[in-house]
């Protein structure tokens, strides 16, 4: 009886499909070499005008990069000038890193808010 119930629960979960998180970040995965340039894109939740970017290097907590609100940079973390960003009139945002260095290997996240 127990294994039948577990199989049923798994089948129900598989049928549920993916849950949309709201914020879309592209590309999802990226591999670059030292010296190259990278651009990441973030589409916020509909109606959100603020977009923030974060970096998380292996074994470390999130580090704030910058925040944009209505196309204007409001806050900036303590990062080199190789890190830059912008926000468009539709609230979509891009983060750029020029001349990549080995220490730039990290998880980059964007978040949106009202």
UniProtKB/Swiss-Prot annotation:
PROSITE patterns: IG_LIKE (PS50835). Residues 22-114 form the Ig-like domain. Disulfide bonds join 42-110. The keyword Ribonucleoprotein does not apply. GO terms for cellular component: plasma membrane; T cell receptor complex. Keywords: Adaptive immunity, Cell membrane, Disulfide bond, Glycoprotein, Immunity, Immunoglobulin domain, Membrane, Receptor, Signal, T cell receptor. It comes from the Eukaryota. Transmembrane segments: none annotated. Glycans are attached at residue 96. The keyword RNA-binding does not apply. It is found in: Cell membrane. Residues 1-21 form the signal peptide. InterPro entries: Ig-like_dom, Ig-like_dom_sf, Ig-like_fold, Ig_V-set, TCR_beta_variable. Pfam families: V-set. GO terms for biological process: adaptive immune response; cell surface receptor signaling pathway. Its main location: membrane. Gene3D superfamilies: Immunoglobulins. V region of the variable domain of T cell receptor (TR) beta chain that participates in the antigen recognition. Alpha-beta T cell receptors are antigen specific receptors which are essential to the immune response and are present on the cell surface of T lymphocytes. Recognize peptide-major histocompatibility (MH) (pMH) complexes that are displayed by antigen presenting cells (APC), a prerequisite for efficient T cell adaptive immunity against pathogens. Alpha-beta TR is a heterodimer composed of an alpha and beta chain; disulfide-linked. The alpha-beta TR is associated with the transmembrane signaling CD3 coreceptor proteins to form the TR-CD3 (TcR or TCR). The assembly of alpha-beta TR heterodimers with CD3 occurs in the endoplasmic reticulum where a single alpha-beta TR heterodimer associates with one CD3D-CD3E heterodimer, one CD3G-CD3E heterodimer and one CD247 homodimer forming a stable octameric structure. CD3D-CD3E and CD3G-CD3E heterodimers preferentially associate with TR alpha and TR beta chains, respectively. This is T cell receptor beta variable 5-1. The lineage of its organism: Eukaryota, Metazoa, Chordata, Craniata, Vertebrata.
């Amino acid at each position: 009886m127990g294994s039948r119930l577990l199989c049923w629960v798994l089948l129900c979960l598989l049928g549920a499909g993916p849950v949309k998180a709201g914020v879309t970040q592209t590309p999802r995965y990226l591999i670059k070499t030292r010296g190259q340039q990278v651009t990441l894109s973030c589409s916020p939740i509909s109606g959100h005008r603020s977009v923030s970017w974060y970096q998380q290097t292996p074994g470390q907590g999130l580090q704030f990069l910058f925040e944009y609100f209505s196309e204007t940079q409001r806050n900036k973390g303590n990062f080199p000038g190789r890190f830059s960003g912008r926000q468009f009139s539709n609230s979509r945002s891009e983060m750029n890193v020029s001349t990549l260095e080995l220490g730039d290997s990290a998880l980059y996240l964007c978040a949106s808010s009202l």
